[in-house]
A protein has these predicted regions:
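Elongated, amphipathic alpha-helical interaction scaffolds
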Residues: 1-193
Length: 193
């Protein structure tokens, strides 16, 4: 039996078209229950003028509402190979998303952003298959962490999740392990045999 590999954009798009799967995927990574979700694949063509190439890309934007009523925009990016040009593309794409207003019930608002990067390569200095980089509010004058949040600050900064596909193992102990197992690459066939 051949199973479609979710690290490929079209396969991941198909998975994310299912609300239940999309809620499970995003909710498991964010460690939150997702009440509502609206996923929109963002299709665009990236032109590398130096190489003379046009590359078709699919990125995913999900607008979610958590069980506590918080709304946020989740950007999901799949990157199969490590490339310096892609790092700049990530940054430009993120900047474009920060510039866009969101619409909830025909009301224009600015949502906080969370990013999820699914990488098909290893970051040599980070050994975990799944990494969370989150915002903490720290009072530098009194050297203590604050629990109070600011809507203004939350909309200027973002949490980030990184999945390193090549570091995923066959460990199935937690809900996150089970989620990551769908990306584990030893079960997939490619043309490199």
């Amino acid at each position: 039996m051949v199973i479609a590999n979710p690290i490929y954009d079209v396969v991941f798009k198909r998975l994310m078209e299912n609300d239940k799967v999309a809620k499970f995927f995003i909710g498991t990574l964010l460690e939150q229950t997702i009440e509502t979700i609206e996923v929109k694949p963002q299709e665009f063509t990236y032109v590398d003028e130096l190489a003379g190439l046009a590359v078709f890309r699919l990125d995913f934007i999900a607008t979610i509402k958590t069980e506590n009523g918080e709304r946020k925009k989740v950007l999901i990016e799949i990157q199969k190979a490590r490339n310096q040009i892609d790092l700049m593309r990530f940054r430009n794409y993120l900047a474009e998303q920060y510039k866009k207003e969101d619409s909830i019930n025909d009301e224009k608002i600015i949502l906080p952003i969370t990013t999820i990067y699914i990488l098909g390569f290893k970051l040599p200095e980070i050994e975990t298959p799944c990494l969370k980089v989150d915002r903490n509010y720290k009072d530098l004058v009194n050297s203590k962490t604050l629990t109070t949040k600011s809507d203004f600050v939350d909309k200027l900064t973002h949490d980030c999740f990184i999945v390193q596909v090549n570091r995923i193992t066959d460990r199935y102990q937690t809900r996150l392990d089970k989620l990551l197992s769908i990306f584990e690459q030893t079960n997939f066939v490619d043309d490199k045999k």
